[in-house]
């Protein structure tokens, strides 16, 4: 199995400032940890290609791109807010992140590798004409559009970020060739306020938008139960040619911006589940990205190092010690192992519905909304 990372130090310049949660240390700490654990030695590493404005324009409007290039606050385009402050070189680095995800897609689609990742990407909130939720350009959507434009028949997109993947869903809402699947904290409590089960796709694409809105406090067992009750079934019905996934790790219980209760072990289990679906359904063709995640030291580097290891084809065992040199770099509170000590087990939904469970209610709501559109019985 061949795995590839698209990366250069230029991608770490995506930086909204020292007090912003989208800290570049999320990526630099991950690269350092992955290097010290030998994970980078098992991956091909290539830099992003030169910026291609025409590629950006397959998703984003020319006037919006021009506004980003000017680098000035502009409320019409969402630029200059507290979430999305303008910073020097914003257009260039956001475009490089986008080129990196498109290059990952190209490498997989042309058969150079089976698996490719861009941990700097996953900017799933960006809309065609405005910045949103720390996301300037929607690299995931550009990568998916590139696949479609280059002969890919169907794309499956799985988003495990705690926030709904609203930008990707909106962009492909009327596109039956793209199935977007998002598991997130309920929008009744959390940004961006979308991602209800009733959002199932536009006319002619019904059943290709799949939303699992989980209650605050959902655990590993809850999340994995929901994933396996829905995601394999809908993807098998869609029959994707390539699987694209976004791996925001802000579902972790220590993340400061959300309210789910997953462990690192549960997140690792989710990455393995996505990889297995790519192997089952797409002959291994899998393009992955990073995403959210704001516990910059204790969670993100370990989570994404696990992702990189899985992309390489050689997963890291959870009991693996964190290298002492990395812990010294990180400081006194650095974790000791690549695990939170959780079992990451779950009871399959098929073993029985629990009426009083808010998680089971969320699962059933999604199955009832989507399964009939795909010719499946939600009760089975």
Model-derived segments and spans:
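A general "terminal functional-core" signal
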Residues: 2-6, 12, 67-380
């Amino acid at each position: 199995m061949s795995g590839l990372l698209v990366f250069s130090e230029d991608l770490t310049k995506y930086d909204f400032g020292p007090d912003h949660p989208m800290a570049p240390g999320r990526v630099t700490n991950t690269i350092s940890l992955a290097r010290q654990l030998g994970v980078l030695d098992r991956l091909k590493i290539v830099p992003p290609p030169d910026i291609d404005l025409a590629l950006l324009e397959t998703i984003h409007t020319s006037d919006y791109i021009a506004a980003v290039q000017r680098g000035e606050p502009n409320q019409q385009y969402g630029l200059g807010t507290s979430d999305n402050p303008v910073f020097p070189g914003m257009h260039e680095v956001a475009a490089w992140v986008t080129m990196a995800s498109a290059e990952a897609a190209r490498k997989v689609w042309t058969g150079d590798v089976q698996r490719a990742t861009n941990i700097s990407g996953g900017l799933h909130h960006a809309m065609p004409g405005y910045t949103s939720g720390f996301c300037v350009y929607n690299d995931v959507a550009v990568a998916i559009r590139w696949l479609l434009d280059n002969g890919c028949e169907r794309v499956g997109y799985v988003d495990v970020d705690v926030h709904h993947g609203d930008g990707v869903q909106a962009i492909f809402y009327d596109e039956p060739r793209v199935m977007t699947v998002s598991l997130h904290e309920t929008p009744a409590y959390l940004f961006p306020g979308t991602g209800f089960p009733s959002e199932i796709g536009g006319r002619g694409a019904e059943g290709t938008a799949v939303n699992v809105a989980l209650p605050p406090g959902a655990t590993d067992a809850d999340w994995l139960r929901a994933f396996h009750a829905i995601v394999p079934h809908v993807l098998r019905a869609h029959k994707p040619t390539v699987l694209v996934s976004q791996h925001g790790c802000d579902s972790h219980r220590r993340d400061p911006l959300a309210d789910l209760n997953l462990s690192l072990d549960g997140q690792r289990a989710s990455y393995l589940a996505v990889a297995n679906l790519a192997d089952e359904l797409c002959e291994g063709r899998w393009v992955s990205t990073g995403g959210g995640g704001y516990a910059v030291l204790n969670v993100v580097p370990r989570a994404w190092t696990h992702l990189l290891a899985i992309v390489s084809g050689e997963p890291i065992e959870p009991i693996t010690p964190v290298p002492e040199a990395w812990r010294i770099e990180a400081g006194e509170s650095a974790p000791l192992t690549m695990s939170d000590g959780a079992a990451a087990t779950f009871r399959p939904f098929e073993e029985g519905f629990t009426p009083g469970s808010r998680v089971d209610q969320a699962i059933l709501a999604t199955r009832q909304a989507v399964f009939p559109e795909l010719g499946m019985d939600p009760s089975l």
